[in-house]
Regions:
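Non-globular targeting/processing and membrane-anchoring segments
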Residues: 1-122, 136-138, 143-311
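Short pre-active-site segment immediately N-terminal to redox-active cysteine/selenocysteine motifs
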Residues: 127-130
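Cell wall/extracellular polymer interaction/catalysis modules
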Residues: 133
């Protein structure tokens, strides 16, 4: 079939067209001009269609405002999903209390410098998208911080496929915004979840000199059990916490919506882990904010967490 389309006209047909052209002066030239314009028109239409198709593909699959987001497989979080996770009723927090959360924040010496931003105490989080312990702890941080303010531009992602607890569903704080009248939240996701050819993972964000100094000073014993672990969280220069407060394996085999639904059931293992951890995080934040807001800091769940963590 394709060979037939490429076949030239046979000799007799070609001679007939040539004779007709000679019998009618100008006819051959007129036909050539028409055919030329027709070719230009077809070529133009094809070019316009091609440009339109490319534009659609770029909009759908091409880089977002952050090309690194696309490379890491992060997707904008569904607003309904975020609303479920950040809208857990106070009664559910109170029912869970500390739950199954462990690995408590540790107090810094009174000589430690206060960590502040824009006149408010600062909660500094340092993690990475590949890290399964970061993946687990982000759930607790996101839930807890939503009691003191609000997030926007959150994206879903997973921990690395080739690490412990592979593909743990989570959120990334990269490019997320947080607004609160009580505290500032600063997040640094150092790498994506995408391996590099020479080992490690693709770089995402860099620590500034002050952040690097805090990590070097406090991400070690006696403030944590080992040196250089993540996630690392500094609560206003008052407390630090390294690692996750629960087992990331509790999230295995589940997607974001399933986990969000389980948070509404205080008897579920996931609610006991994530909400219990969120109460511990909230109790530590309350020490940064002077006990504000009162409806959070004086709630039964946060008070239970404060009692367990020595406050």
């Amino acid at each position: 079939m394709s060979h037939a389309r490429r076949q030239r006209p046979n000799g007799s047909a070609a001679r007939s067209r040539s004779a007709a052209a000679r019998a009618t002066p100008g006819a051959g030239r007129h036909r050539s001009i028409v055919e030329l314009y027709r070719g230009w028109l077809i070529s133009g239409i094809v070019a316009v269609v091609a440009v339109a198709v490319i534009a659609i593909l770029v909009l759908k699959f091409g880089p977002s405002n952050s090309g690194k987001d696309a490379a890491a497989g992060a997707q904008p979080a569904d607003p309904g999903l975020v609303a479920t996770i950040t809208g857990v009723p106070a009664a559910t927090f109170d029912s869970v209390g500390v739950g199954s959360a462990a690995n408590l924040p540790r107090a810094l010496p009174s000589t430690a410098s206060a960590l502040q931003k824009d006149g408010k105490p600062e909660l500094l989080y340092i993690g990475a998208e590949y890290c399964p312990y970061c993946a687990a702890q982000r759930w607790a941080l996101m839930v807890a911080l939503s009691r003191f303010g609000s997030f926007s531009n959150l994206h879903t992602t997973r921990s690395a496929a080739n690490d412990a607890y592979p593909n743990t569903p989570t959120f990334t704080f990269y490019n997320a915004q947080y607004a609160s009248q009580y505290l500032a939240f600063v997040a640094v996701e150092q790498t994506t979840n995408q391996p590099k050819g020479n080992g490690g993972y693709t770089s995402l964000q860099s620590l500034d000199a002050d952040q690097q100094g805090l990590l070097g000073q406090y991400d070690r014993p006696p403030y944590t059990d080992s040196v250089g672990g993540i996630p690392f969280t500094d609560y206003g220069g008052k407390y630090v916490h390294v690692g996750a407060m629960y087992d990331p394996g509790l999230l295995a085999g589940k997607d974001w919506n399933q986990i969000a639904t389980l948070l509404t059931d205080p008897a579920s293992a996931q609610a006991k882990a994530i909400l219990g951890s969120a109460n511990l995080v909230s109790a530590t934040i309350c020490r940064m904010t002077g006990g504000q807001p009162g409806n959070v800091c004086q709630s039964a769940g946060v008070q239970a967490a404060a009692a367990k963590s020595g406050g």
